[in-house]
Amino acid sequence: MSAIVLNEKMEKASELALPESFSGINPHNLYLYVKSAQAAMRANSASALTRAEVRGGGKKPWAQKGGGRARAGSRRSPVFVGGGKAFGPKNNRNYDLKVNKKQKKLALNFALNEHAQKGSLFIVDSIEIASGKTKDAATLFKALNQRDTLFVKTVLDEKTYLAFENIASTYVIEENELNAYLAANYRSLVIEKAVWENLVGEAK
């Protein structure tokens, strides 16, 4: 598998072979990381009151016998409107899933290898919009001729960030923000050469 090296005009200049360590990775590593990332994003805000937490209803609503109705001990029972919820959600649940460092790295390498197979992994010398204008970023993105693209810079400067901010199908991040979830979530990746060299170095 190879990554496509682009020139300043976003045209193909050459190809760069991926290290052997990027191939033969179990896809389950990516599954575990994505599941962990999605679990971390859960708001965990749903919470219902149990019969012990609902206010009022301490008095027995009617006599045990003689009324012809089913016996009831409290208006807080789940069978009544306004009563507590049986087996309802609580916001004290921990959804975190642990993924170790090795699995995180394998997941990212697998995602990069998948992009290389699809021809959607691109390497450039630099990603920089010095003017800070969205128009210039859009021109660069249009020349790339890709959809839903993740740009990865060594260090993200403010002007480049602002230039891409209003282009809905792009996202620019720094090297330390790159992870398997983001890599798998975009149709194509454009990575600065310095970032790519670091990724390859860590894979050895």
Swiss-Prot record:
Single Gene Ontology BP annotation: translation
Residue ranges the record marks as coiled coil: none
Keyword DNA-binding: no
Region entry Disordered, spans: 52-76
Protein keywords: Ribonucleoprotein, Ribosomal protein, RNA-binding, rRNA-binding
GO MF, any single term: rRNA binding
Gene3D superfamilies: 3.40.1370.10
CC annotations in GO: ribonucleoprotein complex; ribosome
Subunit structure comment from the entry: Part of the 50S ribosomal subunit.
Job description of the protein: One of the primary rRNA binding proteins, this protein initially binds near the 5'-end of the 23S rRNA. It is important during the early stages of 50S assembly. It makes multiple contacts with different domains of the 23S rRNA in the assembled 50S subunit and ribosome. Forms part of the polypeptide exit tunnel.
Annotated family: Belongs to the universal ribosomal protein uL4 family.
Protein name: Large ribosomal subunit protein uL4
Source organism: Sulfurimonas denitrificans (strain ATCC 33889 / DSM 1251) (Thiomicrospira denitrificans (strain ATCC 33889 / DSM 1251))
Lineage of producing organism: Bacteria, Pseudomonadati, Campylobacterota, Epsilonproteobacteria, Campylobacterales
Name of the encoding gene: rplD
